[in-house]
């Protein structure tokens, strides 16, 4: 029996997360873990490897590919799958691909709904998953702050924030009917600082987009967007300037703002984060496309 009082703060969080991951595997028939390639996903993957070592992961990793992720994210994803040998499922909404949905042409709201939310629901239906593990944290955003660790979803993958199950200590209600599912958030109680310190202490690989570098960026929708490919409209690309920037969060490149930074190492990122007064999701345009944007997206099935 582990004496939690003798564990460091990070080791307590690690132990809680590993307990939750093992609870999912013990209680559900067909779980899956979301893998969006960012820092939180990287921590989740590391925790899962620890939780079930030396065995292979007992569930696949699912990546919903919107076709607009940073090129480096896709390269990093494929390399990690090759290095670690986990089962990677990649899914894209075929209707969205046919319609050639673009964040530039159709806007963040339509793009996110079609390529992310609908794509995710299609992937979950196709896989028949009854538990979906994700790396969302309560300190990220206000709608996530009020969500349970084991978050119930109906047969349409919808979340009702007014009808959540009580969670007492580390006792979780995992009962569901056929067709229903649960979203599980093992690092709910972690902060952004916890994540970065854990990455540093455990030596977890992350995409270099998190580190400051001279990159070509343009001003778009009130934030700095990196020029990642030639699908960016020429009128925007022609205004590109090289700046020393990095990203605090990763997503579709036209919807993910960079910040000016000189942090090129993990200790420098941690120091910069401690001095920051803004949220890490400040640069995510999908959080600003309507009032209460994230909560409305989650109600419809977004992660």
Curated annotation (Swiss-Prot):
GO BP term, example: hydrogen sulfide biosynthetic process
Top class in the EC scheme: transferase
Pfam families, sorted: PAPS_reduct
Keywords noted in UniProt: ATP-binding, Nucleotide-binding, Nucleotidyltransferase, Transferase
GO terms for MF: ATP binding; sulfate adenylyltransferase (ATP) activity
Catalytic activity: sulfate + ATP + H(+) = adenosine 5'-phosphosulfate + diphosphate
Keyword ATP-binding: yes
Pathway where it operates: Sulfur metabolism; hydrogen sulfide biosynthesis; sulfite from sulfate: step 1/3
Annotated InterPro entries: PAPS_reduct_dom, Rossmann-like_a/b/a_fold, SO4_adenylTrfase_ssu, Sulfate_adenylyltrnsfr_sub2
Kinase as UniProt keyword: no
EC number, UniProt record: 2.7.7.4
Oligomer status and interactors: Heterodimer composed of CysD, the smaller subunit, and CysN.
HAMAP family: Sulf_adenylyltr_sub2
NCBIfam families: CysD (TIGR02039), PRK05253.1 (NF003587), PRK12563.1 (NF009214)
Function: With CysN forms the ATP sulfurylase (ATPS) that catalyzes the adenylation of sulfate producing adenosine 5'-phosphosulfate (APS) and diphosphate, the first enzymatic step in sulfur assimilation pathway. APS synthesis involves the formation of a high-energy phosphoric-sulfuric acid anhydride bond driven by GTP hydrolysis by CysN coupled to ATP hydrolysis by CysD.
Family from the record: Belongs to the PAPS reductase family. CysD subfamily.
Designated name of the protein: Sulfate adenylyltransferase subunit 2
